[in-house]
Curated annotation (Swiss-Prot):
Protein keywords: Host cytoplasm, Late protein, Viral tail protein, Virion
Family: Belongs to the Lambdalikevirus tail completion protein family.
InterPro entries: Phage_lambda_GpZ (IPR010633)
The keyword Hydrolase is assigned to this record: no
Cellular compartments annotated: Virion; Host cytoplasm
Annotated protein name in UniProt: Tail completion protein
Function of the molecule: Stabilizes the tail structure and acts as a connector between the end of tail and the portal vertex of the capsid.
UniProt keyword Transit peptide present: no
Transmembrane segments: none
Name of encoding gene: gene 11
Cellular component, GO, one term: virus tail
Signal peptide as annotated in the record: none
Length: 184
C-alpha cells in the first residue's frame, strides 16, 4: 500500500467510524514504543554487561490512547547500585603477607570490585561500599553508571524505528481496524 493508498484507506475508515483511525494510530505508536524500549535495553545490557532484567525495570512506557495518540517513554537514568547485580561473594586473598583478608576482592556476577565491602546504611538498606581515601568516613556506594549508555541507545533506536517500523505498523493496524469494522 503506497502513501496514496494509505490516505485512501484513512478516508474510507473515517467515513465509516470516527474512532477507527485514532485507535489504529495509538496501537501503532504503542507497538513502536515497546519495540524501542526492548531494543534499547538489549543494546545497553550488551554494552554494560548488566542483566537485561535490571535495565528493563528502568524504562516505563505510558501508552498512547485514542484521545492522546503519543506514547511517553520514561527512563530512570540514575546509577545502578552494585548490590542489585546479584549475590555478593568475597574472594579472600590467601597469601601469607595479606593479613586480615587484605587485597580481597568482592565479586557480584561478572563484576569485580577491589576494596569493596558490604555494609548496612542508616536507612536500613544494604549496599556495596568502597573507600575513597584514608580518613574515617570517606566511603561511597559502588554503582554502575547507566546515564550515558541509556541516553545514546534510546536516541539512536527511536528515530530508526520511527523511520522503518512505524509505516508498517500503521498499515497493519489500519487494515486490522478496517477488518474489524467490516465484520461487525
Amino acid at each position: 500500500m503506497s502513501l496514496k493508498g494509505l490516505e485512501q484507506a484513512i478516508e474510507n475508515l473515517n467515513s465509516i467510524s470516527k474512532t477507527a483511525v485514532p485507535r489504529a494510530s495509538a496501537q501503532a505508536v504503542n507497538r513502536v514504543a515497546n519495540r524501542a524500549v526492548s531494543r534499547s535495553v538489549a543494546v545497553v545490557s550488551k554494552d554494560t554487561r548488566v542483566p537485561r532484567k535490571l535495565v528493563k525495570q528502568r524504562a516505563r512506557v505510558k501508552r498512547a490512547t485514542v484521545n492522546k495518540p503519543r506514547a511517553l517513554i520514561r527512563v530512570n537514568r540514575g546509577n545502578l547500585p552494585a548490590i542489585k547485580l546479584g549475590t555478593a561473594s568475597v574472594r579472600l586473598s590467601r597469601r601469607k603477607r595479606d593479613k586480615k583478608g587484605a587485597n580481597s576482592v568482592l565479586r557480584i556476577g561478572p563484576f569485580r570490585f577491589p576494596g569493596g565491602f558490604i555494609q548496612q546504611l542508616k536507612n536500613g538498606r544494604w549496599h556495596v561500599m568502597r573507600r575513597t581515601s584514608k580518613p574515617r568516613y570517606p566511603i561511597e556506594v559502588v554503582s554502575i553508571p547507566l546515564a550515558a549508555p541509556l541516553t545514546t541507545a534510546f536516541k539512536e533506536e527511536l528515530p530508526k524505528l520511527m523511520e522503518s517500523d512505524m509505516p508498517k505498523e500503521l498499515r497493519a493496524s489500519l487494515t486490522n481496524q478496517l477488518r474489524l469494522i467490516l465484520t461487525r
